[in-house]
From Swiss-Prot:
In the N-terminal section; belongs to the AAA ATPase family. In the C-terminal section; belongs to the peptidase M41 family. Its EC number is 3.4.24.-. It is an enzyme of class 3 (hydrolase). This is AFG3-like protein spg-7. Residues 140-230 are mitochondrial intermembrane. The keyword Lyase does not apply. PROSITE patterns: AAA. Residues 88-117, 744-782 are annotated as: Disordered. ATP binds at residues 333-340. The gene is spg-7. Its main location: mitochondrion. The keyword ATP-binding applies. The lineage of its organism: Eukaryota, Metazoa, Ecdysozoa, Nematoda, Chromadorea. It is a multi-pass membrane protein.
Length: 782
C-alpha cells in the first residue's frame, strides 16, 4: 500500500498527508486544504502520519466525511487538482491558477460548465485520486484497530474498570471505548457470535465483578459502513458486472460474429482465439506435395474427384450441355483408405483456392460459435469462388438430429448442422462456384438432410483396395525405397500376401521394412525385411525375450499345430503361409494365412472357418486332456461368426430367413429388435452351431493325430514353419490353391489396375483453349 502511496504525485501526497494532520488536529476546512494544496513543503513522514492517526479514536467517521468533502472540492475547483499532476509547480503557473480561480468565482460564461472537462485526464485522474484516498483510509483504519479476545477484554478492561461504553456494530463485533489503559491510542474490538450470547456473557461478567447499577456499562447498538470490511462484498458484486461489460464491449468492438468474415479481428476473437471467426485455412497449392499420381488403389473415386476439379477449370464444357455444377460430394469408406489423401491431391492439382477445415473445429465451449463459424467459412469461400471447400470428419457436426444422447452440447451441434444445411442449399444460397467436399467413415450416422442431392450430390465410396489396388499402392510406396528387387514383381507379391490391408496399412508396411533394414545395418531392403514388416503390422512386435515355461511352450506348439492341420485339410479354409510359437503382441503363438479375394460366403465355407478356428482348443483337449485360457480369442471369433450366421445372414432353419440389426462395436444397445422368445431361440441355435463345428473339428484332428504331433515337434525344434515345411511334413493340400498374384488375378481383365480416364477428362489438368484465348485477348487489350 505504501509503495503505491509513494508513487503518487508529490503535490497529491502533500495534500493527503496535510489532510491527515488537519483531521487529527481538528483544524481542517476547505480553505485550509486549498492553501495546503499550494504548499510544496508541508510533507510529513510516514511514521508521523501513523502517529497522528493513532491519537484520534474517531478518525474513521471524520475521515470518510472528509473524503466526500474533498471530492466536492475537486469538482468545484478543478484547477487546484491540476497542480497535483504536474511534476513542478512554477510561480507563473500558481499566479495563472489564482487568476483563473478568481474568474471561476465570478463566473466565466465562456468556459465549459462541466468542471471535469477543464483539466487533463478528466474522470481518470479523479478516479485515481479517490481510489488512493479510499485505499489509504482502509489501510489507516486497519492500523488503528486491534482485535482482542473475550479473555483479554475481561482481564484488561472489565476487571480494571476502564470501559466507558461498548458499541455493538452491525450485530457482529463490539468496539470498546475506554479512557486509558494498556491499549491507549488504539481502538480495541472483539467479534461476537450473536447479540443474545454477548448480552448473557456481559451480564454474567458484570455480576461476577459485582458491578452495581451505577457502574453498569452502557451498550450502544449501531450500524456502520466499514469500507475495509465491505471490500469483499463490493468485489463479488463488481467483478461479474465489470466482466460482463467487458465481454459486451469486446463483442461490440469485434462486430457481429461471423457476419463480416475476418474483418472483426480486434474484438472478442483476439481474446478467445477467433470466437465467431472460422478456423478454415486457405491452402497454398505450392505447399502441397501430393498429386493425383500419388493416389492409387481407388481409381473410380479418383476419377470422380478429378471431375469436380474439371467442373471448376472448364465449366463451359458442362454448361454447353445444360448441366449444373454439383454442389458437393462426400467421401465415405473405412479408415485408412485414402479419403483425406484424395482431398490433399485435389488441393495440389486444382488451380482454384482450396479451403480446408475439420468438423470438430466448429464446436467450442461458447454457445453460438458453431453457426457463426459456418457463416464465416462460407463467406470466405464465396469471396474466393470458384473454390473447393473441404470439411474433414464431418460426422463431428453432421450427426442425425433428435438422437438419444445429448444435453446442451447436442443442441449446439444441431444448430451448427442447421446453419450448414442453410449455407449449402438454403433460401438465400447463391449460384457461386463453391464445391464442398467432405470426408467421413461414419456415413451411417449423418443426417439425411445433409446427404440429399442439392447439398452432397454424390456419395463417393472409397473401399479397401483389392489385390490390383494393393499392387498399385505398393508401387507408389516402393518408389523412394532403396532395394535391388524388381519393384513391379515385389509389389505384386506383397499385394498377394496382404489381403484386407488398407492404403494406410500398406504405407506402414513399407516404412516398417525400411526401419527394420536400418536396424540391421543393411544398405538395402530385402524380401526378409518386407516379410518381417507384414508380420509386425498383422501380429505385433516379436517378443523373443519373453520367457515361457517348458510345459506352456509345448501347449502353444500343439495349439498352433491344431490350427495348421485343421486348416490344411479343410477345403474352404484359408491356405497357411507361416506358423510360429514365438510370442507376438498379446498372443503366445502366431499363424499367417492367405485369404482369397472373396465377397460372398456360403454356409459350408463359414463352417470350415469355424472349425479351423477351433482347431487349437481341440488339439489341447486331445493331447493333454485339458483346456487352457489360450483359446479365448478363438472362442470370441467363433461366437461372432455363429451369431452373424443366425442373426444377420438368415442361415438358421429354426430362426428363418430373418436379419436383425446389431449394434456396431463400441455402441450401446438399449433394446433388442426381437422378443425374448426369439432371443432364446437365437442363443440356442448359436450354441448348436458351435457345438456342431466342435464335433466336426474333433473328428478331423483325431484322424490326423500323427500329423499334429509331427508339426508340433518341428515347431518346438525350429519355432517357425512356413508353407514348404508343412508340405514336407504332411504333404500337399488335397485341394486346388491359388498362391501367386498371377493366379489370383487371372480372368479379371489384366494384371494391373485400369487407370484409363474417360475421354472428357483426358485434359482435366489443362485450361480450355477458349479460356486461354480470352485471357490473352484481355492482356493485349490492357
Amino acid at each position: 500500500m505504501w509503495r503505491l502511496y509513494r508513487k503518487t504525485p508529490k503535490q497529491l501526497r502533500n495534500s493527503v498527508e496535510s489532510c491527515f494532520k488537519s483531521v487529527n488536529s481538528r483544524q481542517f476546512s476547505v480553505s485550509s486544504f486549498s492553501a495546503v494544496a499550494k504548499d510544496d513543503k508541508s510533507v510529513l513522514k510516514q511514521q508521523e502520519v501513523l502517529h497522528l492517526l493513532a491519537k484520534d479514536q474517531r478518525f474513521e467517521e471524520r475521515f470518510f466525511n472528509q473524503v466526500q468533502q474533498t471530492i466536492r472540492y475537486f469538482a468545484s475547483k478543478p484547477n487546484d487538482l491540476k497542480k497535483f499532476f504536474r511534476k513542478e509547480a512554477s510561480t507563473d503557473n500558481k499566479e495563472s491558477s489564482s487568476s483563473s480561480d478568481k474568474k471561476d468565482s465570478k463566473g466565466n460564461k465562456g468556459e465549459d460548465n462541466n468542471p471535469f472537462n477543464q483539466f487533463p485526464g478528466g474522470w481518470q485522474q479523479i478516479a485515481v485520486s479517490v481510489g488512493i484516498l479510499l485505499a489509504l483510509y482502509a489501510f489507516m483504519d486497519y492500523q488503528s484497530y486491534r482485535e482482542i479476545s473475550w479473555k483479554e477484554f475481561y482481564s484488561d478492561f472489565l476487571e480494571a474498570g476502564l470501559v466507558e461504553r461498548l458499541e455493538v456494530v452491525d450485530k457482529r463485533w463490539v468496539r470498546i471505548v475506554s479512557s486509558s489503559g494498556k491499549y491507549a491510542g488504539q481502538t480495541c474490538y472483539f467479534n461476537i457470535g450473536s447479540v443474545d450470547s454477548f448480552e448473557r456473557s456481559l451480564g454474567a461478567a458484570q455480576h461476577h465483578l459485582q458491578y452495581d447499577a451505577d457502574r453498569q456499562i452502557p451498550v450502544l447498538y449501531k450500524s456502520e459502513f466499514n469500507f475495509k470490511r465491505e471490500i469483499p462484498n463490493l468485489i463479488s458484486v463488481a467483478f461479474p458486472l465489470l466482466f460482463g461489460y467487458y465481454i459486451y464491449r469486446m463483442l461490440k468492438g469485434g462486430g457481429a460474429a461471423g457476419g463480416a468474415g475476418r474483418a472483426g479481428g480486434g474484438g472478442l476473437g483476439g481474446m478467445f482465439g477467433g470466437f465467431g471467426q472460422s478456423t478454415a485455412r486457405v491452402i497454398n497449392r505450392e505447399d502441397i506435395k501430393v498429386k493425383f499420381a500419388d493416389v492409387a488403389g481407388c481409381e473410380e473415386a479418383k476419377i470422380e474427384i478429378m471431375e469436380f476439379v474439371n467442373f471448376l477449370k472448364n465449366p463451359q464444357q458442362y454448361k454447353d450441355l445444360g448441366a449444373k455444377i454439383p454442389k458437393g460430394a462426400i467421401l465415405t469408406g473405412p479408415p485408412g483408405t485414402g479419403k483425406t489423401l484424395l482431398a490433399k491431391a485435389t488441393a495440389g492439382e486444382a488451380n482454384v483456392p482450396f479451403i480446408t477445415v475439420s468438423g470438430s473445429e466448429f464446436l467450442e465451449m461458447f454457445v453460438g460459435v458453431g453457426p457463426a463459424r459456418v457463416r464465416d467459412m462460407f463467406s470466405m469461400a464465396r469471396k474466393n469462388s470458384p473454390c473447393i471447400l473441404f470439411i474433414d470428419e464431418i460426422d463431428a457436426v453432421g450427426r442425425k438430429r433428435g438422437g438419444k444422447g445429448g444435453m446442451g452440447g447436442h443442441s449446439e451441434q444441431e444448430n451448427t448442422l442447421n446453419q450448414l444445411l442453410v449455407e449449402m442449399d438454403g433460401f438465400t444460397t447463391d449460384e457461386s462456384s463453391v464445391i464442398v467436399i467432405a470426408a467421413t467413415n461414419r456415413v451411417d450416422i449423418l443426417d439425411s438432410a445433409l446427404l440429399r442431392p442439392g447439398r452432397f450430390d454424390r456419395q463417393i465410396y472409397v473401399p479397401v483396395p483389392d489385390i490390383k489396388g494393393r499392387a498399385s499402392i505398393f508401387r507408389v510406396h516402393l518408389g523412394p525405397l532403396r532395394t535391388s528387387l524388381d519393384k513391379t514383381v515385389l509389389s505384386r507379391k506383397l499385394a498377394a500376401h496382404t489381403p484386407g490391408f488398407s492404403g494406410a496399412d500398406i504405407s506402414n508396411v513399407c516404412n516398417e521394412a525400411a526401419l527394420i533394414a536400418a536396424r540391421d545395418a543393411n544398405h538395402e531392403i530385402s524380401n526378409k525385411h518386407f516379410e518381417q514388416a507384414i508380420e509386425r503390422v498383422v501380429a505385433g512386435m516379436e517378443k523373443k525375450t519373453q520367457v515361457l515355461q517348458k510345459e506352456e511352450k509345448k501347449t502353444v506348439a500343439y495349439h498352433e499345430a491344431g490350427h495348421a492341420i485343421a486348416g490344411w485339410f479343410l477345403q474352404h479354409a484359408d491356405p497357411l503361409l507361416k506358423v510360429s510359437i514365438i510370442p507376438r503382441g498379446k498372443g503366445l503363438g502366431y499363424a499367417q494365412y492367405l485369404p482369397k479375394e472373396q465377397y460372398l460366403y456360403s454356409k459350408d465355407q463359414l463352417l470350415d472357418r469355424m472349425c479351423m478356428t477351433l482347431g487349437g482348443r481341440v488339439a489341447e483337449e486331445i493331447f493333454f486332456g485339458r483346456i487352457t485360457t489360450g483359446a479365448q480369442d478363438d472362442l470370441q471369433k467363433v461366437t461372432q461368426m455363429a451369431y452373424s450366421q443366425v442373426v444377420k445372414f438368415g442361415m438358421s432353419e429354426k430362426v428363418g430367413p430373418l436379419s436383425f440389426e446389431t449394434p456396431a462395436p463400441g455402441e450401446m444397445a438399449f433394446d433388442k429388435p426381437y422378443s425374448e422368445a426369439t432371443a432364446q431361440l437365437i442363443d440356442q441355435e448359436v450354441r448348436d452351431l458351435v457345438m456342431n463345428a466342435l464335433r466336426r473339428t474333433r473328428d478331423l484332428l483325431l484322424e490326423k493325430r500323427s500329423d499334429i504331433e509331427r508339426v508340433a515337434l518341428r515347431l518346438l525344434e525350429k519355432e517357425i514353419l512356413n508353407r514348404e515345411d508343412m508340405i514336407e511334413l504332411v504333404g500337399k493340400r488335397p485341394f486346388v490353391e491359388k498362391n501367386t498374384y498371377e493366379e489370383m488375378v487371372s480372368g479379371t481383365g489384366g494384371l494391373d489396375e485400369n487407370v484409363e480416364l474417360p475421354k472428357g477428362l483426358e485434359n482435366w489438368n489443362k485450361e480450355s483453349e477458349k479460356k486461354k484465348k480470352d485471357e490473352e485477348k484481355k492482356k493485349n487489350d490492357e
